[in-house]
């Protein structure tokens, strides 16, 4: 299960609640990629790219203006998960060759990356783009453990 994989990835580590919440969002991104692998074989992607682009644009525009504080007093997009969301969008569109290299989504992802320098957007894009197609349960769990560790702890890969 997703919960078990996340717990395995974070065993023995102390992780902020917001990061833990983000790990579940990242797991949903992985599931979305697999669902889109099937969906995009039978349906056009003409609405998917604008949807991803508008969501990313809204999150980049909604980022906090001040340096991050322990307790945010006003709602705003979290720059860390916005950067991972940007990587998800890029990974998905690159996985299915949906946009050209000069598409606006790359500019938005660059802006998101600048707002969260501790998040390696390029590495997360690669992780999402290169997820195994039609993985078995073990492959999926290992990929989820790896991406969870990479996000929450900047950490190591899962053992085979």
Predicted region positions:
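Pan-zinc metallopeptidase signature
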Residues: 44-160
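Post-HEXXH active-site segment of zinc metalloproteases
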Residues: 1-29
């Amino acid at each position: 299960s997703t919960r078990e994989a996340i717990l395995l990835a974070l065993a023995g580590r102390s992780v902020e609640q917001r990061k833990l919440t983000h790990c579940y969002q990242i797991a949903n991104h992985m599931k979305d990629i697999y669902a889109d692998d099937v969906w995009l074989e039978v349906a056009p992607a003409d609405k998917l790219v604008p949807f991803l682009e508008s969501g990313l644009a809204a999150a980049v525009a909604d980022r906090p203006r001040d340096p991050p504080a322990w307790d945010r007093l006003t709602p705003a997009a979290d720059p860390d998960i916005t950067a991972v969301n940007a990587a998800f969008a890029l990974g998905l569109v690159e996985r299915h060759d949906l946009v050209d290299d000069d598409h606006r989504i790359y500019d938005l992802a660059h802006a998101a990356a600048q707002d969260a320098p501790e998040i390696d957007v390029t590495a997360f894009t690669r992780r999402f783009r290169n997820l195994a197609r039609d993985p078995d349960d073990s492959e999926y769990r290992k990929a989820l453990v790896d991406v969870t560790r990479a996000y929450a702890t900047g950490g190591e890969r899962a053992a085979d």
